Amino acid sequence: LRERVIAAGQELFHKRGIRAVTMDDVSHQLHISKRTLYQLFDTKESLLLACQQKAMAEHQQQIEHIMAETDNVIEIILSDLQLSMMEIQKFSKEFLNEIPLYDKLRENMLHHRKENKANALEFINRGISQGLFRPEINAEMVYEVGVAIIDTLVEKGLYKTVPLFEL
């Protein structure tokens, strides 16, 4: 039941935004009582965190699958970018704009980015050793620029106007 609640929460939050969705909406969607829902998640924010953690875990699984199929760093990075953009396109503008308003969501996302930074730097350094990137590049700066590009695409809503194959 917990997984069904998380899936319903993801669908509603992504489609309508965080503020527009109530715990009542989630319970109605699943045809369960609010009491049952609150036994699983004591607050809307705890449900939001569970939804976010599930999405991050699924993304990580997909990246690990891609990494198992290829050693080419460029393919992995482009696949990750394409996967991220496809995921972001599922979100309403309201949802994306409201994420920063929730401290725990924002903190969780920053923590996730910090964890992934080490992996990203490893990919960049592997690309250097594979001869795919110039040896004098600053891996940290490349990572920060990549993050800034994604943030800008999201912030300005450009992810909806730029075809994926052009990214």
Region locations from a protein language model:
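Short coil/turn segments at alpha/beta junctions that flank glycine-rich nucleotide-binding fingerprints
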Residues: 15-19, 70, 130
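Hydrophobic alpha-helical connector segments
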Residues: 50, 54, 61-90, 143-146
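Helix-turn-helix
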Residues: 4, 8, 12-46, 50
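An amphipathic alpha-helix signature
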Residues: 6, 78, 117-125, 139-143, ...
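Hydrophobic/aromatic-rich alpha-helical bundle segments in the mid-to-C-terminal region
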Residues: 96-99, 129-167
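Amphipathic alpha-helical interface segments
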Residues: 8, 12, 36, 83, ...
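Amphipathic, non-transmembrane alpha-helical scaffold segments
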Residues: 2, 6, 48, 52, ...
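Short secondary-structure transition hinges
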Residues: 83-122, 129-132, 140-141
